[in-house]
Amino acid sequence: MRIEIRKDGNSTAVLISFDMDCSKFGSSYERNKFFRGLYGWEQVIKKNNSVYHYHREGVMNEVPHIKVDNSVFIVAMEEMQRVLDYFDGWENKVHWKTFQVLLTPDEVRLLEKKANESDLSEE
């Protein structure tokens, strides 16, 4: 994926990169809580010879994004604040940086498609 930095234009988005200070987390449970809140998770319950699967939503299930790497993703400019609000709750343990980027037309269409899918799933 080629990314160009630009200060204005309709196809600008935000690349968000985050890093965790593992020594500040009290336990692996707390660290997992951060990731579950961000990305969501699949809950599996086995009961009475049956298995039930439940998808628990995270912030990124609601925000259309392009995943670049494990802790790097691109979101539309208007969705950035929702992600940063979540990170603010973890500010002593998670560090992040944002970079304004210019998307190619294909990447803009991909973000729009994901936004439309997100809108349909909320109905």
Q: Where are the regions that the model predicts?
A:
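Short, intrinsically disordered low-complexity segments
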Residues: 40-92
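Conserved short beta-strand edge segments in small beta-sheet-based binding/regulatory domains
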Residues: 92-107
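Short, low-order "capping/linker" segments at domain edges
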Residues: 109-123
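Short acidic, S/G/P-rich loop/turn micro-motifs used as interaction or catalytic elements
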Residues: 21-25, 79-80
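Short, flexible turn/loop "capping" segments at secondary-structure junctions
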Residues: 7-10, 64-66
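Active-site-flanking beta-strand signature of metal-NTP-handling nucleotidyl enzymes
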Residues: 12-22
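Domain-level signal for Mg2+-assisted phosphodiester chemistry and nucleotide/NA-binding surfaces
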Residues: 31-37
